[in-house]
UniProtKB/Swiss-Prot annotation:
Family (UniProt): Belongs to the GatB/GatE family. GatB subfamily.
SUPFAM superfamilies in the record: GatB/YqeY motif, Glutamine synthetase/guanido kinase
InterPro entries in the cross-refs: Asn/Gln-tRNA_amidoTrfase_suB/E, Asn/Gln-tRNA_Trfase_suB/E_cat, Asn/Gln_amidotransferase, Asn/Gln_tRNA_amidoTrase-B-like, GatB, GatB_C_1, GatB_Yqey_C_2, Gln-tRNA_amidoTrfase_suB_CS
Key word Nucleotide-binding present: yes
UniProt entry keywords in alphabetical sequence: ATP-binding, Ligase, Nucleotide-binding, Protein biosynthesis
Assembly behavior: Heterotrimer of A, B and C subunits.
Domain of life: Bacteria
Protein name listed in UniProt: Aspartyl/glutamyl-tRNA(Asn/Gln) amidotransferase subunit B
GO biological process: glutaminyl-tRNAGln biosynthesis via transamidation; translation
Species this protein is from: Rhizobium johnstonii (strain DSM 114642 / LMG 32736 / 3841)
Amino acid sequence: MTLVDVRTPDPKRFIPGATGDWEVIVGMEVHAQVLSNSKLFSGASTEFGKPQNSNVSMVDAAMPGMLPVINEECVKQAVRTGLGLKAQINKRSLFDRKNYFYPDLPQGYQISQFKDPIVGEGKIVISLGPDRQGQFEDIEIGIERLHLEQDAGKSMHDQHATMSYVDLNRSGVALMEIVSKPDMRSSDEAKAYMTKLRSIVRYLGTCDGNMDEGSMRADVNVSVRRPGEDFGTRCEIKNVNSIRFIGQAIEYEARRQIGILEDGGKIDQETRLFDPNKGETRSMRSKEDAHDYRYFPDPDLLPLEFDDAFIKALEADLPELPDDKKERFVRELGLSIYDASVLVSEKAIADYFEAVAAGRDGKTAANWVINDLLGALNRTGKDIEQTPVSPAQLGAIIDLIKAGTISGKIAKDLFEIVLAEGGDPAEIVEARGMKQVTDTGAIEKAVDEIIAANPDQVEKVKAKPTMAAWFVGQVMKATGGKANPQAVQALVKAKLGIEE
């Protein structure tokens, strides 16, 4: 494969070294476990967390005479993913044997795709920002290919003092290997790419994206060069399993390579591991080339062939993807690009927001979801699937504000009650006497008392009318936030002789 540089060197992404500026080049190979009930070539279950070696068929264990049979759902999931990446779908693809020895690879080879993958070139658009001017930078990252392959088993070295064990539950599980082009120029871009890719496959329902369970992991290829020069020798960092670690691994590896080159050394092409405890990479083995694996077509599997009708049927069934949803939120609901980006970052958040916004003002719903709900979830270490406040409950709080039943301040208190205790917002307001005071007589009495008690402030307001806000705040405080803010403001201005 010939590597093509499509990016213009950008000084703001350069890494300063002792002898001048450097540029980091990043490409990624992401292994995404296909969401399916059974494995790629057998009927064994893919359920996570089952007892060791309980999800294993004769095919997975490579018993003699056991032949692989392709799982149609895995093929469909790969095509769906390719369509979501705006990629070329290859109507004919082949499975190959990738030959290497490892204890948790019972066949002695991995069934993969080499020269003829199921999906060809595509792209992902990532967005960095906002910057100090509130602007976002969109960057297109090329996709080289997507191919299907089997996962290996898992070697376990902590079960016995002198022996290692092998768990084959994962052996034969379908993986999509999504290979990017070397188009990323910083750790931030790489993290944004992984975040966006995970969001896309979750929207599509083709991978759950749970990196902590190994459902999605990345091999990160890193090299450095002087700006504008040819690509340098790359090192591959294997099986990085969190977005934060991807960033840390790239930062460390770029600095390591720069240090070697500035000392007059050369970079060896090798495979490395990232140690998250030390925040550094370490050598694992020399990097293999394709010829080391002796690829050849798998004689037990026919070519995969499908027609336009097959592809179009899958395309017609695709859900709305993050970029399209973001554009719709901005266009139809009047949201800012930032707010829309936050809301579409995860499908579950977008679904929650749309349920709250249905029949309500979109901007108001967005403010409550982003600032109050997501803020509270971050404080408590929960994600959107664990939220104790349902869309119906949050929507009810917004409705109570619109109806004038409660003030914005009381709504914040009500939200915290629902967050901690649950319950129907309207019933809580009634039971706890949280209704907004709309009786102008009661509000006028409070205004008169505050004005009478603060003659000095009255004189200041005459000189500077904007200070009337101080009186509004004092009245709201005196009424426990229950007074209607608009009524308070109108009465304060009238009493102080301030023209509207």
